[in-house]
Amino acid sequence: MTHPVISLKPSYNSVIRGCPGLPDTLPRIECQLRVRSNNSLPFKLVKIEIVLKTIEIYFNKNLYSSNNSSFTPFNRPSDPSNGHSDTSNQNISIHYKKNIVLSHPTHDGDDLNNDLIGIDIPLTIGLPDDIKETNYNPKFGKTQTFLDCTVFYTEVGGGSSNKKRNFLYPVNVERYTYLPSPSYFRPINRSNITSPDQKFLISYSIENPCVSMNNDTLKLSISIRLNPFPNNATTPSSNDFDVSTPTLFSTKKKFKSKLKLKSITTQILEYLEILKNQSEFSSTQTTNILQTSVRQVDQIISMNSMIFQFNLKIFTKDKILQSFRSSESSCPETKVLINKIDDIPLQYHSSITTIGQHFNVSHYLSIRFKFNKSLKNFEINHPLIISFWSVSQLPLIENLILQERQTAKFAKKFYKNFGRIKNTSNNNNSSNCLEYPSLPPIIYNFNDPETNNRFNILYSQKDPSRTDPSKLRRVPVIQ
């Protein structure tokens, strides 16, 4: 039975050109949609529907139990990819939708005017500025983008009822907005922050507030001392940053405290924020602790600052990949990866900072101070960004961005010959998206000598008129 076979041919190594997240690079999908007859016999093309969509799924809190093995998220029976609605919430964002219909017959005045054996359609689809990157977070959810192509057709001589064939192609989106470089994210310095009871002054600095998910180091410096003017304010305010430094002759009795700083605990946390309505995310956040580090201090706090330096190792890839970062000379244990979830490659299985239409995943650094008097304990939180890219990739990425910006200039000139690139607004949200002009397709007519020669289609001739397909038999050709 004759039916169309659908495939995609990327224009380059990837279907994505430009750098998603950087509008001046014209992030877009460039590929060729190929529709071919499965047996070189004709079919009638009705229309082709093309949809670009992003699917966001966040997991329920109790989706993963605490007794999961180290092989999670692989082969988990309760994974939402099996389609159970009780374990996930799903949102679909449509970025692009278009119906393609042949407006001119392929053979004028002939009964075979819609009989094809193939068609090639160049596709250029602009990616919206806020498109979400491909990611699988084992705790919170996953995000995927698909190019969904459906061909509606009828068989030649097989009646007028339409049939359809579908082709779903995953598009792995990587955003270039968060790069772990001082050029993009400068060091953070916070000075003279008062504790909730106004007894302490804390200063901290973060050298690299944007870190990589892949074995990066977060450099943190903390200093703490007694507040010389604890009664100047009853609640923390912006004036806390202007507290003057005490002199060497400060000998008031209230500073002769025996308060001990027992320990400093640092944690890397990830938060899940779910969209509550069209303009507001949920106020209640689901928290997950990625890693914890405790430093024992056990020292008396005085007017002199106590300074602590931290080098926190960051690795938020999936647990199954952590065994490959061992520096031991022994051969690591062999582990078999049986499958992957919904065709999401392993490099996207990690906890990174993402912003989407349905849910966000953000990260924070938590600094907890524990004293010998429990009422004095307090905590400081500071937002972090965990990037998909590693520090070693930065030179290559920066070079790629420069190349894509240059290519975008030539692309604008090219598409100007077929019309102009238009700015459009997505109907589902306020994101900006570019609409590219349509490029002419290549149509492969049935029984066309040039087409037969192109695809090495040879027939044993039983009908001299070559008009009855039932009397034609394809001769197999070994290539």
UniProtKB/Swiss-Prot annotation:
Annotated region described as Disordered, given as residue ranges: 460-479
Functional note: Regulator of RHO1 signaling that acts as a cofactor required for the efficient localization of the TUS1 GTP exchange factor (GEF) for RHO1 to the bud neck during all phases of cytokinesis. RHO1 is a key, essential hub protein in the cell wall integrity (CWI) pathway in which activated RHO1-GTP binds directly to and activates multiple different downstream effectors required for cell wall synthesis and actin assembly during cytokinesis.
Gene Ontology CC annotations of this record: cellular bud neck; cytoplasm; division septum
Top-level division of the source organism's lineage: Eukaryota
GO terms classed as biological process: division septum assembly; protein localization to bud neck
Residues in coiled coil: none
Gene name of the record: RGL1
Note: Present with 396 molecules/cell in log phase SD medium.
Protein name (database record): RHO1 GEF localizing protein 1
InterPro entries documented for this protein: Cytokinesis_Signaling_Reg
Annotated knockout phenotype: Impairs the efficient localization of TUS1 to the bud neck at late anaphase.
